[in-house]
Regions:
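Cell-envelope/extracellular polymer assembly enzymes that use nucleotide-activated donors
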Residues: 3-5, 29
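Short, well-formed alpha-helical segments that are part of the catalytic scaffolds
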Residues: 8-26
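Short, charged/polar "capping" segments at the starts of alpha-helices
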Residues: 14-17, 37-43, 109-111
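Acidic donor-binding segment of Leloir-type glycosyltransferases
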Residues: 21-52
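Glycine-rich, basic loop-to-helix element that forms the pyrophosphate-binding segment
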Residues: 53-68
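Short acidic donor-binding/metal-coordinating loop in glycosyltransferase active sites
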Residues: 54-55, 77-81
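Short aromatic/hydrophobic "clamp" motif used to bind/position activated sugar donors
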Residues: 74
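Conserved catalytic core of nucleotide-sugar-dependent glycosyltransferases
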Residues: 82-142
Length: 142
């Protein structure tokens, strides 16, 4: 899976991020984006890129960083989840421009975010994928 770059967005779970990075470092290139300027993330070596931001750039940071790397796919992971490598392979095998484990539907009829329907780990058509674990083809962002 060397054509996928893992981008982990850290804010308050550095121990979990460390576990994710160490699990994946032999499977694919890894980048950690630390959005917590009060708690710099240590450099781990082993080819793991660590970016310590001077301020919290919120969720948009994950998408901006996609443009800095050459791999044709980016696996975006939040700091509170640890995807199993077999899940990533299953997502990749779908060969879709974007696939995730969490999405929402019902935008057309909802009056608020709370009225949207959640879809976790199910094969469903959604209006949008919400963070968590997302595999995206870079060409879908270009």
């Amino acid at each position: 899976m060397d054509n996928i770059r893992l981008i982990i967005l850290n804010y308050k779970r550095p121990d979990n991020v460390d576990n994710i990075a160490r699990t994946y470092k032999t499977i694919m290139p890894v980048t950690i984006v630390n959005n917590n300027p009060d708690n710099p993330f240590p450099y781990l070596g082993d080819g793991i890129d660590v970016i310590n931001n001077e301020k919290n750039w919120l969720c948009m940071e994950r998408w901006v960083r996609c443009f800095e790397y050459d791999e044709p796919y980016k696996l975006i992971v939040d700091d509170d989840l640890m995807p199993h490598p077999s899940l990533v392979k299953k997502m990749y095998d779908k060969q879709l421009p974007i696939v995730g484990v969490y999405g929402k539907s019902g935008v057309e009829s909802a009056n608020s975010y709370q009225e949207l329907t959640d879809h976790w780990n199910e094969n469903a058509k959604v209006d949008f994928i919400a963070g968590a674990i997302t595999l995206i083809k870079q060409s879908a962002l270009d």
